[in-house]
Amino acid sequence: MIYINFYELYNIKNIRPLIPSFHVCLLIMFLILYSQEILSFFFMCSKFSMNSLKFCVLFSFKTVYSLLKLIKTLIRKLLYCFHYALDLFADEYKVTANDKHYDYRLKSHRIKDKITTKCKGTTKYFNSRHFEIKNAVENLPSFSSNLTTIGNNLRIFWKNGKIRCIKLTCTPDAEIVNFTSNPNRYRFYETNMQELIRKTICEKSDKAIEKTFLCAQLFKTFCEDGVLQTFQPGFIQLDIASNLQEIKKGTKEYSLKSLEMTTTKESNETLCSNDSKHRIARLKNEDNTQKPISKKRKSKKASHKYLSSRTAPNVDFGNFAKERHRENDVSELYSKTKRTSKIRELYKEIGYDKNEFIHELRENEGPSVLYDSGLDQNGTNYDDAFAAPEAISIEKYVSINEEDPKSPKKETSYQVQEKLSQFFQEEMIHLLEMGEACTSRESQKTRKKNLKENIRKQRTTSTAIRDIAIKFLDDAKCETEDSTNLTNREGEAEKTLNTQPWKNLIENFISELQAEEEENNITEWSDIISVRNDEENQIYELPTCQLETNLLV
């Protein structure tokens, strides 16, 4: 006998209708009985039975069974051809699960529900749309490869343990991740999960990387019970804003590229702001009997291009001086090792060797710059006297680096200049703190009193800023020089004011003075500070400002 397995020739698996096939059979029988008479129906049945017997003589029973199975499959395919395209016109789906038997019900309105998941002993909620499970296929196999969102687009579709089409839609802040599947629009990729990840993701990982997470760990966290346990092809939306970081920490295998994607601005803030903030917070909590902190100085020009995001702390430096004078340990307040290591890293990023760098500084600026930059006269050791923002003379040095065609990192000079500028701005806070710590209380009061008198007498912002610069230089170096060296210090202060970092600090200082509107008897004046740059010959004009008597207290 001839055996032909029609069902295996045209194998359409896992096609489930929206209504049972038994109801379809009853409907067909009703139509036949309604249109034909009973006798004709019996005659038709007898004729059909005779033909069936003749057919069974020629072919085996298995052949007839396979043919009937094929007819049944074709009927399902024709009647419910829109089953795969169900997500094109339906708003939502509702899924009920019972031992891998699923009931599909089409809804005309959106259904939203809250699903509870357990994450590291705590119960967390996330909004999830109901999604369609096409059939009871195998569970999603676990794997340890990292899924990376490339260009915010990555879709995943799997069937019987194999990925067909993969695409994921992720918001820039990674608050919502959408897993969608649509086999009617996208071409299938008949391959296993590991190969697809290696081909489509790992080879393109050098492009725009937004978020990286371990897919298997993500599924284990959010798919612990219920229908989500057997994750099937379909649509799901997860809110992972509060769980993504915990998933990263709890996973041993994850891409380190996500940790390296910190921008230059974030690294600068980490470089400059941590030490001073922790130090100020520690000193504020040491003594509960400390005097109340002075009022905060809020600048009206918050959008000024020279204003840094980290301004000087609004604290009473006199009280801090008492605490530091009691400790008698300036090195504990400001770590020399950390700061010098940062300077070494900045030297390396420019692209020059340290010996060449020292040689250029010695020729262009003289030995004083070497001392201010933390180097001794021989240029071999790093010192703790980081006195002024002009120490490394970064503007002149970067210009030399850009003109040199042999420079290995010519394109990074501007980034290094910005990084050093922000680093110097944060050093201003350290100079204030160290200056108050090194000098005695009597000299502090005398210096501040003389400074106030000079401000009242001269009433020029240029002289006031110059005196402030001298105070910063003297206090940072912890020097007790005679009045005969005042001229040299003024010249050094003028040289300091000509550098770009100090220009930024001066304008920041003036903008803070403009925001002060206290009741004082100091008269108001208008003056222009002409800070001339020898190379560009530019004049920076500063607007009207108002000072008060307790400004530097």
Swiss-Prot record:
Indicate whether Isomerase appears among the record's keywords.
no
Q: Does the keyword Iron apply?
A: no
Q: Which UniProt keywords apply?
A: Meiosis
**Basic residues composition-biased segments:** 293-304
- Segments carrying the region annotation (Disordered) are 267-305
| BP GO terms, sorted | meiotic cell cycle
Compositionally biased tracts (Basic and acidic residues):
275-289
Q: Gene Ontology terms, cellular component aspect?
A: cytoplasm; nuclear envelope
Write the protein's name. Meiotic expression up-regulated protein 18
Source species of the chain: Schizosaccharomyces pombe (strain 972 / ATCC 24843)
Per the UniProt record, the lineage of the source organism begins with: Eukaryota, Fungi, Dikarya, Ascomycota, Taphrinomycotina
